Amino acid sequence: MRIGNVEIKNNIALAPMAGVTDLPFRLLCKEQGCGLMCTEMVSAKAVLYNNKNTEDLMKTVPGERPLALQLFGSDPDIMADIAKRLSEREFDIIDV
C-alpha cells in the first residue's frame, strides 16, 4: 500500500488516539506487525508555543517508520506554518 511516496508494508494502520498512542505503545504495535504508526493528535498551537507535553507526544525512534502525525487546530495560517515545520522532521505523513 502507498500513501503518496510512502510505502506501507501492509494495510494495518494505527489510529491517532489521544492518551494512547505514545512511543512505547507505537513500538509495541510495530512489533506486532502494524504497517503505519501514528502519533497522538497534536495541537498546532501547542507546537507553535513549544509546549513540552506536545514535544513528548511527538517523540520517535528510527525503527517505528513509516510514521504519521495528525495535526489539529482552527487557524489555517498556524496549521500551514506548523505542518511545514513538522514536514522537516522525521514524520513521513502529516495528516491535517
What are these model-predicted stretches?
Residues R2, M17-D92:
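Glycine-rich, positively charged N-terminal anion/phosphate-binding segment
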Residues E7-I12, R65-A68:
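Short beta-strand/loop segments at the ligand-binding rim of alpha/beta enzyme cores
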